[in-house]
Design a protein with these regions (language model features):
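Short, Lys/Arg-enriched N-terminal segments with co-localized hydrophobic residues
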Residues: 1-15
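Conserved short S/T/G-enriched processing/targeting/catalytic segments and their helical context
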Residues: 12-15, 19-116, 162-180, 234-259
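A generic local secondary-structure boundary/capping motif
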Residues: 18-20, 48-52, 114-120, 129-131, ...
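Short, flexible beta-strand-to-coil junctions
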Residues: 24, 67, 131-137
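Ordered hydrophobic segments in well-structured contexts
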Residues: 29, 61-63, 127-129, 141-143
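Short connector loops at helix/strand junctions that flank enzyme active sites
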Residues: 57, 123-125
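A two-mode feature
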Residues: 99, 106, 110, 125, ...
């Protein structure tokens, strides 16, 4: 509708975010922060991890990064299609590939609507991670680009990041592997977020975390991690201590390195 398009064009708030999703042998792990900003004087909290599903049949999770109005429009269109029973929708299609394709087409359509309504040179793009499982198929994880195309996670590359990814990438590259147990993978992902939070003010608590077990076909409740969360605070402290201790235990550089 017209008022929604006008709001979409005027909204300049961006999800300066970090989202991480893992597709492993035993299941899927999703973590997103919640910070958005339209400048240093306007910082807000918005959920960026969205779930859909039918217990016993399908579980779908979407994570968003980019222009807030664009991402909310995409989620809104997908939800409206379910309410109005429009075809295709997230509950009527049969494979996760089709889910990623539907999300990509919806995103592309939203961006085309924006470009037809404004000549302003502003980035309204966003990226979306799509993961889940539909009965009869395997778990899948996709990275959907603003152009509507997408790529799939593999056993060799079992994770995707969107947003402010560089600070949290090293621990994933060094420690994560496809057969890693889900609890270890969750811990690895939380350390990735702790590293990002320490180095980038545009990413902030609270975090939303969710773990899906393969072939369970349930919609997990998930966990909101706040500043006073005891476990997250504990692993943050222990990770810092482990790095300092590991540095001290490394062999000292030989004279030809620095003398």
């Amino acid at each position: 509708c017209l008022w929604f398009k006008c709001w979409l064009v005027e909204c300049k708030e961006n999800e300066m975010t970090y989202c991480c999703a893992l597709r492993l042998e035993q299941g899927l792990v999703f973590i997103s922060d919640t910070r958005t900003n339209a400048g240093v004087d306007h910082i807000s909290v918005f959920r960026k991890l969205h779930t859909f599903g039918v217990t016993g049949e399908r579980f779908i999770a979407l994570q968003t990064a980019g222009n807030l109005a664009t991402t909310q429009a995409v989620i809104g269109h997908l939800q409206n299609a379910l309410i109005l029973q429009q075809e295709p929708n997230l509950y009527s299609i049969n494979t996760m590939f089709e889910v990623a394709d539907l999300v990509g087409k919806t995103l592309k359509s939203v961006l085309e609507d924006i470009s037809s309504d404004t000549q302003e040179q502003m980035n309204y793009a966003c990226s979306i991670l799509v993961g889940g499982q539909i009965k009869g198929g395997d778990m899948q994880l996709y990275n959907v680009y603003p152009q509507g195309n997408f790529i799939c996670a593999t056993t060799d590359t079992p994770y995707f990041q969107i947003g402010e990814s560089k600070y949290g990438k090293p621990i994933l590259d060094r420690a994560l592997y496809y057969a890693m147990p889900l609890d270890d993978a969750l811990r690895c992902s939380l350390i990735s977020f702790d590293s990002t939070l320490r180095s980038n003010v545009s990413v902030g608590l609270p975090l939303d975390a969710l773990v899906y077990s393969k072939d369970s076909f349930v919609i997990p409740m998930g966990k909101r991690i706040t500043e006073d969360d005891p476990y997250f605070s504990q692993i943050s402290r222990q990770w810092s201590d482990t790095l300092r201790r590991g540095l001290q235990e490394m062999p000292k550089p030989t004279d030809d390195y620095w003398r």
